[in-house]
């Protein structure tokens, strides 16, 4: 697995530079009142001038679901998804409203209306205690709905997990940062505790993919190689036609059982 976990130092430096320093003129940075005049706090769900120049766009503006809908729906299943304090909140299943017959209101994954090819995606997330969720990409709605009547996306998944308590931590390729069910994250990763914000990044260009967690690359893969073909053949995706041959699809936030929050969701085409 060593070749899958190579740390790309140059990319790390570029990534840091891309999200630094210059703020949008419409939302200026402010000093953090902690006795450190050198530290500033940047507004959430905004783009800096540098990010705009580099081609970044917001997928979530902090106040609306513009650009999103439920997978298999024309609208957002708002019984399961809410906007709260500048975040997208996935409501825990136990808190979802009940219908008159006692069944929970319909839910499902939250999907971008647009599809993307050759992109870099960044976002921040925090998970609930023993929580499990994910961000899926290269998703075909048609394939997903044909194989998942519960409005669940089929695509490559960046796993988001409370590694300390969720039972999925027993499977290396199911831990936070993993390419779910395919490649485990680098063992040296840094995962923030429950209740704190993690920063994640996906790079997907041509046959090449990368997962980053809190500034460090934790997964690297190349589709079409004998190694990747072998991993796919042993995974949950092995019987899904064209799963790994498509190079464009939707970005999806997973509707799992647990509560999770998302913010600062940004993308740029490479």
Each predicted region: which residue ranges?
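Carbohydrate-interacting regions of secretory-pathway proteins
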Residues: 19-270
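Bacterial N-terminal signal peptides that target proteins for export
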Residues: 1-8
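Hydrophobic h-region of N-terminal signal peptides that target proteins for export
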Residues: 11-20
């Amino acid at each position: 697995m060593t070749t899958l976990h190579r740390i790309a130092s140059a990319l790390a430096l570029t990534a840091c530079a891309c999200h630094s320093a210059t703020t949008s003129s419409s939302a200026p940075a402010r000093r953090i009142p902690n006795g450190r005049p050198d530290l500033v706090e940047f507004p959430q769900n905004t783009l800096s001038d540098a990010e705009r120049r580099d081609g970044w766009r917001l997928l979530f503006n902090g106040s609306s679901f513009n650009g999103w809908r439920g997978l298999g729906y024309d609208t957002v299943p708002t019984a399961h998804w809410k906007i709260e304090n500048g975040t997208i909140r996935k409501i825990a299943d136990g808190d979802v409203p009940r219908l008159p017959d006692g069944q929970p209101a319909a839910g499902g994954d939250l999907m971008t209306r647009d599809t993307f090819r050759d992109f870099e995606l960044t976002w921040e997330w925090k998970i609930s205690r023993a929580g499990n969720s994910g961000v899926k990409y290269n998703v075909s709605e048609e394939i997903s709905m044909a194989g998942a009547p519960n409005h669940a996306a089929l695509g490559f998944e960046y796993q988001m997990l409370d590694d300390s308590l969720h039972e999925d931590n027993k499977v290396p390729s199911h831990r936070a940062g993993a390419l779910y069910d395919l490649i485990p994250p680098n063992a040296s990763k840094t995962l923030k505790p429950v209740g704190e914000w993690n920063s994640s990044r996906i790079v997907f260009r041509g046959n090449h993919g990368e997962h980053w967690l809190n500034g460090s690359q934790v997964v690297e893969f190349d589709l079409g190689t004998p190694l990747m073909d072998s991993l796919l053949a042993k995974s949950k995706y092995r019987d899904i036609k064209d799963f790994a041959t498509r190079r464009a699809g939707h970005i999806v936030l997973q509707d799992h059982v647990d509560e999770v929050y998302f913010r600062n969701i940004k993308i740029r085409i490479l």
